[in-house]
Amino acid sequence: MQKKIKVLCVDDSALIRSLMTEIINSQPDMEVCATAPDPLVARELIKQHNPDVLTLDVEMPRMDGLDFLEKLMRLRPMPVVMVSSLTERGSEITLRALELGAVDFVTKPRVGIRDGMLEYAEKLADKVRAASRARVRQNPQPHAAAAAAAHGQTAAAAPLINNPLVSTEKLIIVGASTGGTEAIREVLTPLPPDAPAVLIAQHMPPGFTRSFAQRLNGLCRISVKEAEHGERVLPGHAYIAPGHAHLLLARSGANYIAHLSDDPPVNRHRPSVDVLFRSAAQHAGKNALGVILTGMGRDGAAGLLEMKKAGAYTFAQDEASCVVFGMPREAIAMGGVDDVAPLSDMSRRIMARLASMGDRVQRV
């Protein structure tokens, strides 16, 4: 009999603890081994139960979730799924938690509202399963490299790429899920200010993508923003799919245009990586580079293969540097990947490939 995933739920709301316990215990492969109203109680329960996964509320009394997470990742690294409110403050704190080493996050369940609860339960269970298999980063220190990149200094973990490029038609198309927020940061921060435009589909709910874009914009030398429908896609800019919509690449004459769609989810996701990749295959062809990063599931694998068939050069993050080696594994298995790269070298390889593409990208 397969061993069940042991989950410790930490939340100051007894109602939320009860609801999370009900959802997790309804799954055949996982169980709640204990619950805690605050991090100080959780600390003792971790010693007693040795859980496989921790779900952690962002804001709690006695010690907030971030302080506890920082100590936990330093002293006893383990997979953590943050539980966050759908507020601007909640999204900012959650992004900081992902920087500190949390594997993923879910929004708080809406107590007393049954509509959508089955979908929420499936999402929570999927994230707990993925977290139980995730590679937890030991003592993550994201700010040093990111701050260095923002100020034009070289950091050992993320050397800046200073090959000036002039390109009006090259595009970098990126897809990610679990662990993707930090992977995307590591890919974007070394890019030079005149890098080709970057379009990104990261699995993330509404309300979080804007904060994610704003956070990256303060760390990167390129401009980063949440994509808007109909806007022109420009070099030196990165466009992140909003949490409520698919992002597609479109054309208006010689110009690339961002197109947002509220079509149904694809592979259970909106935004979907496959949707973005397929639009890039159709409208950019060999002028695009496709990049699939860490994430559970298979979203993006088929789309990356379509990009490759259309002439694009494609990259996948390697297993050793992925938090969850799901999407890249599927893309590699389908034959849609030209180059498998560690995350620490991904930006350099992308820019080297662009520089090798002849008269379509020139050094100056």
UniProtKB/Swiss-Prot annotation:
<feature type="active site">
    <location>
        <position position="177"/>
    </location>
</feature>
<dbReference type="GO" id="GO:0008984">
    <property type="term" value="F:protein-glutamate methylesterase activity"/>
</dbReference>
<dbReference type="GO" id="GO:0006935">
    <property type="term" value="P:chemotaxis"/>
</dbReference>
<feature type="modified residue" description="4-aspartylphosphate">
    <location>
        <position position="57"/>
    </location>
</feature>
<keyword id="KW-0597">Phosphoprotein</keyword>
<keyword id="KW-0963">Cytoplasm</keyword>
<dbReference type="InterPro" id="IPR008248">
    <property type="entry name" value="CheB-like"/>
</dbReference>
<comment type="similarity">
    <text>Belongs to the CheB family.</text>
</comment>
<feature type="active site">
    <location>
        <position position="203"/>
    </location>
</feature>
<dbReference type="GO" id="GO:0005737">
    <property type="term" value="C:cytoplasm"/>
</dbReference>
<dbReference type="Pfam" id="PF01339">
    <property type="entry name" value="CheB_methylest"/>
</dbReference>
<protein>
    <recommendedName>
        <fullName>Protein-glutamate methylesterase/protein-glutamine glutaminase 1</fullName>
        <ecNumber>3.1.1.61</ecNumber>
        <ecNumber>3.5.1.44</ecNumber>
    </recommendedName>
</protein>
<keyword id="KW-0145">Chemotaxis</keyword>
<dbReference type="InterPro" id="IPR011006">
    <property type="entry name" value="CheY-like_superfamily"/>
</dbReference>
<feature type="domain" description="Response regulatory">
    <location>
        <begin position="6"/>
        <end position="123"/>
    </location>
</feature>
<dbReference type="GO" id="GO:0000156">
    <property type="term" value="F:phosphorelay response regulator activity"/>
</dbReference>
<dbReference type="InterPro" id="IPR001789">
    <property type="entry name" value="Sig_transdc_resp-reg_receiver"/>
</dbReference>
<feature type="active site">
    <location>
        <position position="299"/>
    </location>
</feature>
<dbReference type="InterPro" id="IPR035909">
    <property type="entry name" value="CheB_C"/>
</dbReference>
<dbReference type="InterPro" id="IPR000673">
    <property type="entry name" value="Sig_transdc_resp-reg_Me-estase"/>
</dbReference>
<comment type="function">
    <text>Involved in chemotaxis. Part of a chemotaxis signal transduction system that modulates chemotaxis in response to various stimuli. Catalyzes the demethylation of specific methylglutamate residues introduced into the chemoreceptors (methyl-accepting chemotaxis proteins or MCP) by CheR. Also mediates the irreversible deamidation of specific glutamine residues to glutamic acid.</text>
</comment>
<dbReference type="GO" id="GO:0050568">
    <property type="term" value="F:protein-glutamine glutaminase activity"/>
</dbReference>
<dbReference type="Pfam" id="PF00072">
    <property type="entry name" value="Response_reg"/>
</dbReference>
<keyword id="KW-0378">Hydrolase</keyword>
<feature type="domain" description="CheB-type methylesterase">
    <location>
        <begin position="165"/>
        <end position="357"/>
    </location>
</feature>
